[in-house]
């Protein structure tokens, strides 16, 4: 099936037909589309959003060329197009798939993601795409592209897309064209000085000779005032007042939302500070407990060393006593209480048996 490349996110109205009819349609999960780093370097584990940036990064590593060289199979990869995982989205249809991975990720973040990672410090507006946030910073504080509902857009394509769906747009006055025609109709008779227009006013009187044409035109206020233009002027005045009220109300609503957002941000910052202080106190208590346990461990270690020294001295005394014993009956008497202690029985019995053997030999 032959696929066509849809309208891009930057508002390009020209769709281009894919030259490769065997393009592979790829449908990524929302979790994959929300990942910030899609391509990871296998040497230093650094992530990149584009494959081109990863290839340029690999050149910085001083590794043999064989590791950077691609196989022929990798070069003959089919072209891929990406569809949106949302079933109700236009780009979910393969005929409207996007031909760039970065484009589909920006589209999903911009249209279907709720998490606004980048927030403007001046107006507290959040953006899910970093490029949109940077474009907003360039025009934040200026008028930019303002809609009749009070919203201001930094991108032309976003402003046009909003106007297609905005329901608070200012209605065009229907009598504006009639007002222009009426004004033109008032100006048209002023350019002529024919006396025919005064015929009904001079009924029953002899006609006067028309005055000689002169190069100077009479001023516009010399003609009689037409009362029919008054309703149009009042209508235009009412429309201007209505537009001013709508814009003022929109600005008031925007200021109120900004103040509420700032209050919520301050409350969250206060809670975060309290949590940080509590964590700091817990860390200090844990450090004190650790120092106490460390001191107790050192004391126990010292006591254990002293016990080892006492044990060594006792063993030395036992050995010296065994060497002094020469009577066989005394050895038997000394052997009875020693066997009661199971911890030193093996050591004492070895010395007793050796001493007994030496006495019998003598």
UniProtKB/Swiss-Prot annotation:
A Pfam family cross-referenced in the UniProt record is: C2H2-2nd_BIRD-IDD
Which residues does UniProt call coiled coil?
Answer: 252-319
- Chain intervals annotated as zinc finger (CCHC-type): 118-142, 145-168
Residue ranges, compositional bias (Basic and acidic residues) = 251-278
Induction pattern: Not regulated by auxin.
Q: Which UniProt keywords apply?
A: Coiled coil, DNA-binding, Metal-binding, Nucleus, Repeat, Transcription, Transcription regulation, Zinc, Zinc-finger
Binding residues annotated for Zn(2+) 1, in chain numbering: 120, 123, 136, 140
Zinc finger (C2H2-type) boundaries: 39-61, 82-112
Please give the chief subcellular localization of this protein. Answer: nucleus
Give binding positions for Zn(2+) 2. Answer: 147, 149, 162, 166
In alphabetical order, the GO MF annotations are: DNA-binding transcription factor activity; sequence-specific DNA binding; zinc ion binding
Subcellular locations according to the entry:
Nucleus
Region feature SHR-binding, mapped onto this chain: 155-167
Kindly list the GO CC terms recorded for this protein.
Answer: nucleus
Stretches the record annotates as Disordered? 1-22, 247-278
Which tissues is this protein detected in according to the database? Answer: Highly expressed in leaves, hypocotyls, roots, vasculature of cotyledons, floral organs and in the endodermis and vasculaturenof inflorescence stems.
Q: Name one GO biological process term.
A: gravitropism
Role noted for this protein: Transcription factor regulating lateral organ morphogenesis and gravitropic responses. Has a redundant role with IDD14 in directing leaf and floral organ morphogenesis. Acts cooperatively with IDD15 to control silique and branche orientation. Involved in the establishment of auxin gradients through the regulation of auxin biosynthesis and transport.
Q: What is the name of this protein?
A: Protein indeterminate-domain 16
Provenance organism = Arabidopsis thaliana
Q: What is the lineage of its organism?
A: Eukaryota, Viridiplantae, Streptophyta, Embryophyta, Tracheophyta
